[in-house]
């Protein structure tokens, strides 16, 4: 049973609504389905470390990859529920962050769960009945969901900075140049973090475009 893989990306793929990556691990290519929201990172990274869930069937083996181990472990809990297959499990983790999904299940918020495509009210209620007393470990011991939400917000800002770093690096800028120029964003971390967490995907893209223009202008000034 494969539990974890580290390797070099060969290419990314898309089949219908499913997206993933092929990893070269010791000369063997592993085809792994990812959460769609992880594909942007897959496009720019050459090396991956993924937590894996493996499903074996008569017609072949499927691998599902997750950047964080708690995503993989919650995925396993979700697909243990009768009537929920791996594609619905992936859709739920695409729709929600782990603490948000755990919170919805523990608080019996079936209407929130039905936001996920493929989840009707009956399946949402079954998910709640079967899992609501099994997810304590995902709340990080004694931490509250509210504290976890703060962690998510900080993590979102960190991922946002990572994305900008990768874009600048792909444009040929070196580490020291990038770290210095990114300070114009990190100096206002609290303000920018709040903006990110209250913005739609389109607004986040506009914010990133604005920040990249500011950074590139600053970098061009240094080279003149």
UniProtKB/Swiss-Prot annotation:
InterPro entries in UniProt: DNA_helicase_Holl-junc_RuvA_I (IPR013849), Hlx-hairpin-Hlx_DNA-bd_motif (IPR003583), NA-bd_OB-fold (IPR012340), RuvA (IPR000085), RuvA_2-like (IPR010994)
Region described as Flexible linker: 147-155
Main location: cytoplasm
Cellular-component GO terms for this entry: cytoplasm; Holliday junction resolvase complex
Keywords: Cytoplasm, DNA damage, DNA recombination, DNA repair, DNA-binding
Entry's localization field: Cytoplasm
NCBIfam families given in the database record: ruvA
Function of the protein: The RuvA-RuvB-RuvC complex processes Holliday junction (HJ) DNA during genetic recombination and DNA repair, while the RuvA-RuvB complex plays an important role in the rescue of blocked DNA replication forks via replication fork reversal (RFR). RuvA specifically binds to HJ cruciform DNA, conferring on it an open structure. The RuvB hexamer acts as an ATP-dependent pump, pulling dsDNA into and through the RuvAB complex. HJ branch migration allows RuvC to scan DNA until it finds its consensus sequence, where it cleaves and resolves the cruciform DNA.
The record's note on its domains: Has three domains with a flexible linker between the domains II and III and assumes an 'L' shape. Domain III is highly mobile and contacts RuvB.
Entry similarity comment: Belongs to the RuvA family.
Assembly description: Homotetramer. Forms an RuvA(8)-RuvB(12)-Holliday junction (HJ) complex. HJ DNA is sandwiched between 2 RuvA tetramers; dsDNA enters through RuvA and exits via RuvB. An RuvB hexamer assembles on each DNA strand where it exits the tetramer. Each RuvB hexamer is contacted by two RuvA subunits (via domain III) on 2 adjacent RuvB subunits; this complex drives branch migration. In the full resolvosome a probable DNA-RuvA(4)-RuvB(12)-RuvC(2) complex forms which resolves the HJ.
Name of the featured protein: Holliday junction branch migration complex subunit RuvA
Species in which this protein is naturally found: Prochlorococcus marinus (strain NATL1A)
Gene transcribed to yield this protein: ruvA
């Amino acid at each position: 049973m494969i539990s974890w893989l580290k390797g070099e990306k060969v290419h990314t793929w898309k089949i219908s609504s499913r997206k993933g990556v092929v990893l070269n691990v010791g000369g063997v290519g592993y085809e792994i389905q990812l959460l769609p929201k992880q594909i942007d990172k897959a496009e720019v990274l050459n090396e991956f470390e993924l937590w894996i869930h493996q499903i074996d069937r008569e017609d072949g083996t499927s691998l599902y990859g997750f950047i964080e181990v708690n995503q993989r472990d919650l995925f396993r809990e979700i697909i243990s529920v009768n009537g929920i297959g791996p594609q619905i499990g992936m859709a739920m983790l695409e729709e929600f962050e782990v603490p948000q999904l755990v919170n919805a299940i523990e608080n019996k918020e079936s209407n929130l769960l039905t936001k996920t495509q493929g989840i009707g009210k009956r399946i949402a209620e079954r998910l709640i009945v079967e899992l609501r007393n099994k997810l304590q470990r995902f709340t990080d011991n004694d931490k509250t969901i509210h504290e976890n939400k703060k962690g998510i917000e900080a993590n979102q800002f960190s991922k946002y900075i990572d994305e900008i770093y990768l874009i600048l690096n792909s444009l040929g800028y070196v580490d020291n140049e990038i770290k210095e120029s990114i300070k114009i964003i990190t100096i206002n971390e609290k303000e920018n973090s709040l903006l990110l967490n209250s913005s739609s995907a389109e607004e986040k893209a506009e914010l990133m475009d604005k920040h990249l223009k500011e950074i590139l202008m600053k970098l061009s000034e240094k080279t003149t």
